[in-house]
């Protein structure tokens, strides 16, 4: 007995305190099986119901009248269709990232596990270690739904900051349909009031980093997988603490610290040489020629490392810049003080609160630099911004580039 059609519906409604799902599977014998309940709970099963497609159409119509919508941001496995799925990010990373020692293999496993934990601990998205699938009660989240969720998050944040809580009902309803959360039996409004926008953004970034697609075809009860897409084209090597490059980096790390940041006791625990092929090639071809190469630190959370190793640093969508509160527009930010960058990885300015902090060392191709005296994006004709301490009410320099090809990642530092 095979499933010929799957329907996933959800009703998240801030006014009615609804956070419910309704799933139905139509089998080839005409029977329909239903699973329904509150997001975060196992749900109740019903069926089989007879009547086939006509019964299913009738129930869908009834549910829509009650505020349910069909969820279109998923990919659902089917015995008769070709689908995109999420492969096991841990196995893909270990297989494709080129590394030179068992220490690095353990690091890759750790970063993949952190990526998974960041998703599953803050949402109702689950991970199946056997299949490598991340799924919601409605199915598998796709990149398109992640993009939509980012835009909705920016809208919700803007409306909250403008004191227009009464207007963001449709946006929060849609967001919770795309990225289901379990907040128990408490009111949806309580979730909204305590919403951590940076945590939500980090979750979306982690989910996007974990999405690797390959085609699955099912023929006569036999699964054939196409050649797996090359996701990680990157080399990692350890940098021994006796190496001249390590000593030079460590000196810069220590001498650039500012006492005001409170990281005097943080040291470099491990250093790694990073070569992301696409990132290096793009920088050599289009970025380096801009000139004014400047070395910077870039702090990030452990959960985001896998994403950066996969694709390099990317200028985020405008909605992300707004959510993160970036002063000088939508770009990638770097610091010439290690302690400034450490604030982003140890949680002071919106990063994680993990035991280890993580800094990338990058070369920024600054090109024609804009030195602002107030917040905002640079005027047309500039390649970058260097906001200097003392200007714009800043205590420390911030460097911003606005195109991916202006960034070249060279090292990764673990700090404790």
Please provide the spans of the model-predicted regions.
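Conserved aromatic
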Residues: 46-53, 335
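Segments that shape or occlude catalytic/ligand-binding pockets
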Residues: 42, 57-65, 223, 228-230, ...
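Intrinsically disordered, low-complexity terminal and linker regions
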Residues: 1-21, 26-33, 39-47, 59-304, ...
């Amino acid at each position: 007995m095979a499933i010929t059609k799957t329907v996933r519906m959800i009703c998240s409604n801030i006014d009615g305190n609804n956070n419910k799902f309704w799933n139905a599977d139509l089998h080839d014998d005409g029977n329909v099986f239903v699973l329904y309940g509150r997001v975060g709970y196992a749900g109740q099963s019903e069926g089989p119901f007879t009547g086939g497609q006509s019964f299913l159409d009738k129930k869908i119509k009834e549910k829509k009248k009650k505020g349910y919508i069909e969820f279109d941001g998923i990919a659902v496995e089917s015995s008769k269709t070709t689908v995109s799925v999420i492969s096991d990010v841990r196995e893909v990373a270990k297989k494709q990232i080129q590394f030179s020692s068992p220490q690095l293999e353990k690091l890759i496993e750790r970063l993949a596990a952190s990526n998974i934990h960041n998703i599953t601990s803050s949402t109702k998205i689950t991970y199946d270690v056997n299949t490598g699938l991340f799924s919601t009660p409605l199915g598998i989240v796709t990149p398109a739904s992640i993009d939509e969720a980012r835009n909705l998050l920016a809208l919700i944040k803007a409306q909250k900051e403008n004191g227009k809580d009464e207007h963001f009902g449709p946006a929060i309803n849609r967001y919770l349909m795309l990225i289901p959360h379990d907040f128990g039996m408490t009111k949806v409004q309580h979730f909204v009031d305590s919403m951590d926008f940076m945590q939500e953004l980090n979750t979306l970034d982690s989910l996007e980093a974990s999405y690797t697609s390959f085609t699955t075809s099912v023929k006569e009860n036999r699964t054939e997988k196409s050649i797996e897409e090359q996701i990680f084209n990157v080399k990692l090597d350890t940098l021994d603490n006796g190496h001249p490059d390590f000593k030079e980096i460590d000196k810069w790390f220590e001498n650039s610290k500012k006492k005001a940041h409170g990281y005097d006791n943080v040291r470099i625990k491990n250093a790694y040489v990073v070569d992301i092929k696409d990132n290096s090639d793009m920088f050599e071809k289009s970025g380096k020629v801009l000139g004014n190469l400047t070395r910077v630190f870039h702090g990030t959370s452990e959960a985001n490392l896998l994403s950066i190793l996969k694709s390099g640093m990317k200028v985020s969508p405008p909605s992300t810049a707004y959510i993160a509160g970036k002063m000088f527009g939508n770009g990638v930010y770097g610091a010439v003080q290690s302690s400034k960058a450490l604030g982003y990885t140890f949680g002071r300015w919106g990063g994680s609160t993990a035991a280890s902090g993580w800094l990338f060392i990058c070369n920024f191709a600054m090109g024609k630099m804009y030195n602002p005296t107030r917040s905002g994006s640079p005027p047309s004709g500039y390649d970058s911004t260097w906001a200097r301490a003392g200007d714009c009410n800043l205590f420390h320099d911030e460097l911003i580039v606005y195109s991916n090809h202006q960034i070249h990642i060279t090292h990764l530092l673990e700090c404790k």
